[in-house]
Regions:
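DNA major-groove recognition helices of helix-turn-helix
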Residues: 121-132
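Short alpha-helical "recognition helix" segments of helix-turn-helix
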Residues: 109-114
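N-terminal positioning helix adjacent to the helix-turn-helix/winged-helix DNA-binding module
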Residues: 77-80, 91-93, 124
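Short amphipathic alpha helix immediately N-terminal
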Residues: 89-103
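N-terminal interaction/assembly modules
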Residues: 1-87, 134-137
Length: 137
């Protein structure tokens, strides 16, 4: 696994969690909204006795459990990446990698926080990635 791929694992998982949160919001809206009546003629052999919103409530419960598990996994991956970043010797490079891959800051935000120009910050980031790949197995 490339160093960049290893470092991006928390970011990817965080995006998946955010997508699940959006999906959870849709399910919550659907569980509160009335369903439209069906005017077509149909004769179910096994009538459904559950209210229409119950299936959305079940999906909400399942999704909330998945999100909780994903947060636990995200913490584990962040700890693993944080320990791997310690391999880099330069503290400024470590700081750049932590801002980027553990706090999910954008390049302009990192450059503002570190009081560097964006161009210099990108150069330091490339150098930090090279140092990380040399030290990480």
């Amino acid at each position: 696994m490339q160093g960049n791929e290893f470092l991006n694992r928390p970011f990817i998982l965080n995006n998946k969690i955010n997508d699940k949160k959006i999906k959870l919001g849709f399910y919550r809206e659907l569980s509160c909204s009335p369903s439209s009546p069906g005017f077509e003629e149909h004769f179910p052999s096994n009538p459904n006795t559950k209210a229409p919103f119950v299936r959305y409530l079940e999906k909400i419960d399942d999704l909330e459990q998945e999100i909780a598990e994903d947060y636990k996994m995200l913490d584990e991956i962040k700890n693993e990446v944080d320990n791997a970043i310690d391999v880099v010797e330069d503290p400024m490079e470590q700081m750049i990698l932590r801002y980027r891959y553990l706090e999910f800051l954008s390049m302009p935000d990192i450059s503002v926080r570190m009081h560097y120009s964006l161009r210099w910050k990108k150069k330091l980031h490339r150098r930090a990635l090279d140092s990380f790949e040399r030290g990480h197995p």
